[in-house]
Amino acid sequence: MNRTPIRRCKSAEIEEDPFSPIPKFSRLRTPRTSREYVCPLKSTSPQSPSSSTENEPPPVSVTSPPARKRALEESTVTPIQQKIGPPVLKRSSLSKLADGFRTAAYLNNESENDDDPFGLSFRNEQVLMSKCAPAPEKRPETLTLDPSKCLPERDMEMYRKIKKLDKFYDWQQECLSDKRLLDGENCILSLPTGAGKTLIAEVLMLREAIVRKRNAILVLPYVAIVQEKISALAPFEDAFGINIEEYASNKGRFPPIKRRKRVSVYVATIEKANMLINSLITQGQLDRVGMVVVDELHMIGDGGRGAILEQLLAKFLYKGTGQIVGMSATLPNIDDLKFALRAFVYSTNFRPVELTEFVKIGQTMHQVSENGDLNPAGDLPTNNLKSTDPDGICQLLAKLIPKNSAVIFCPNKKNCENVAVLIAKTLPAHIRQAKRAESDAFLQSYLSDNDDERMDAVLKQCILSGVAYHHSGLTQDERKCVEAAFMEGLIYVVCATSTLAAGVNLPVRRVIIKAPMVGRERLGKAQYLQMAGRAGRAGFDTKGDCITIIKAGEEERWFREMLKSDIPRCMSSLSSEESMGSFILDCVVLKLAENIEEIMTAVRYSLFYAQESPENIRKLVESSVKRLEEHYFITIEPLEQDVASEPSAQASSIPRVPGKISPSDLGNAVFNAGFDPDEATRLHADLVSSLNQGVIFASHFHLLFIITPYEQVCNINWDLFLLMYNALPSSERKLLAECGLEEKFILEAIITRVDLTAGTPRMRLYIALMLQKIWNHEPMYTVAERFGVEKGWLQATLQSSISQAASIAKFSEKITTMWPLRKLLPELVQRLSEAAQPELLPLMTVDGIKKARAAILFKAGYKTVGMIARANPLKLVQELGTIRMAQANSIIASARMVLRDQVDEKMEELDVWGVATDSFNYF
């Protein structure tokens, strides 16, 4: 075997740049072979000449949509392409990290070596194998792939222009040309993270809105993702003449506004989507929804929220006439979901950007093979910063930044902050100062727009150095600031908790998992894949890698087992009496079911029915019905002939109930408020107790206590509690005494340092004291500092309290004895939500306008939402001074949405009175 000549290093080369690592002998290698991914396509051979046309997509039709086919269809799953041929071999070059991270990071990424996937070199010459792309398959000639069949040509061109797309991936063209999808059959898209599933969802929703003239619902897991998607879809409003409506947090009306001439795409969280489905069924308007798209479909097995997702899908399957499209990258038991949703499955292993997974144990790198084995890939140089950076994170960033970016997933919030500070201190000066001026201007803009005009001092210094941390302890504004700075290239490294993996999309070149833990729990297979999938996103990088740092020993053993294990099955969340009872109550109130047999019919459309035997299902349904009756949520009218013919029915531990089932006033109230029945039982008892004993009106403290959520908990500062207790008026001390919180108890707690649990009256009273400070217009930053809690936690608690107050108000609408709460709580909600001058409140309904910015606009003459909606973006930038043109356009677009909603609500009222409104125009 011929060997390539060895290049010797001359001493002159070293003297030219004393900061460069000392080069060692390295073997020259031939250029790397192409690794371009080609989508493995399913081949469908025609059975007969007459059947060959079945593969051709139908032309665009503007007729009414076909009814969904209820029968289960055989799934045609695109087979995952196996790797073909030997792996591509990479010969590592040799170098040494001189003077730790500072010297190595001095090197520019312009000299990045493709042979070195870590941005570093190994000390030995072990072979490093890289994942090889599958060989292309020949596409069947009988299959005509034309995604324009999904949308009219003009609209498809407009979509490509907005999304800046040259062409679709092969699998996207194939999927959008699938006859089953175009015929309205339900579909599950199972593809890797970053494969481009979102494009399919957007095109299908546009097809439903433009071609079939029906609304669509996009269900997303988190509020932050909904807000991000609203911004991404905003250009569709003017381009396609549709409405994009947000249903998250405190946004969204029930029932939705009846639009004139336009159809809507509702972008909603799981909870809001369920309430939206309920309101449409109540109004008899569910047929207006032609499509429900669910992102992260695997969350159907995620406990409480999974139960809500399963319920909304079951109700839509049972009574709706539209199409369901579910998307996920981690669905192990996909056949169960296929059965439950009456869907076919489209699956491929295509990923547009190559992803390589590594595990770092000590100073040795291992590559993760397809079957989960760890193959030694080489040794890293000595970690010269081991005393301050024992995990060697700085080594893994050395040649990556500032040209590329990285996300470091840490086990907890405190660890995020510590790692971010470490990296910020260790970065070379030329990297820290590279964009300091731009970062400083960016932060000044943020602070001028922020009502508190303050930011965490540590976070601010990190951002100025090109590093940041991101976790739930930050406020929403701080998190958005970090995300915006990252997208503008001012931040190179983000240290985050695991929630970011399923949250906001931050495209990075490298993902580093600092420890295989989430809090105190071990990292699961699905979580690991989700984190790793964040590396190397299409349109931003040509490749990506994930490096997990593991300790040798027990941690290494179970991590190896996790890599080789299967993803846990996605199990139904309706398997308990609590969750099944909630579903049954919804069905009864919505008049979807009036007896056991009709309830059993509704359950047939759930994942639970696909995973459990009919006998166990009936047993759970009957016990859940009995439980609802015992808690007075429903009433049962047994049929006389059945009672006479079955005298032994009462002797049964779980009786068969043959009569009509109706909701009680309490059941209607629970449904109207969107409460869980178990939660409502405790809440109802507390509300009755408060009203019977009398609400203390000397201040708003008692009302704030009533709306304090049960699930919130924090550490108690008993010394502060005693000071605040002594400062309370006698009327408020009376309330604390009724809840068992007297001065004697506080004094004992100061000594014993007792911890309070979530939901107890004492804990809720302590949280109510924080809400009272905010009610009195104290800045949130100051309140959080005084009580020793995180600003992000306090903000989340405030928002949860506002939602709780709104829900209690709806709850009170159905129970006549609670009329005082129905009258008092709406004002409380408004004041807690805005806490501003009354004249500024209308302006603050616009996204991007808070109290400080609203005051500037009001002073400049923008006194109504309509004036902002008609504003010139350039003039708006000049008036505010601290915003960019993109922000100005976003504010104007949001103002137009608010104005549109207000006008449509008035038009809806005029339509009821028979007033002609066809000639009206918004602007």
From Swiss-Prot:
GO terms for biological process: DNA double-strand break processing involved in repair via single-strand annealing; double-strand break repair via alternative nonhomologous end joining; double-strand break repair via synthesis-dependent strand annealing; resolution of meiotic recombination intermediates. Residues 392-596 form the Helicase C-terminal domain. ATP binds at residues 191-198. SMART domains: DEXDc, HELICc. Residues 178-349 form the Helicase ATP-binding domain. It is found in: Nucleus; Chromosome. Single-stranded 3'-5' DNA helicase that plays a key role in homology-driven double-strand break (DSB) repair. Involved in different DSB repair mechanisms that are guided by annealing of extensive stretches of complementary bases at break ends, such as microhomology-mediated end-joining (MMEJ), single-strand annealing (SSA) or synthesis-dependent strand annealing (SDSA). This is Helicase POLQ-like. It comes from Caenorhabditis elegans. The lineage of its organism: Eukaryota, Metazoa, Ecdysozoa, Nematoda, Chromadorea.
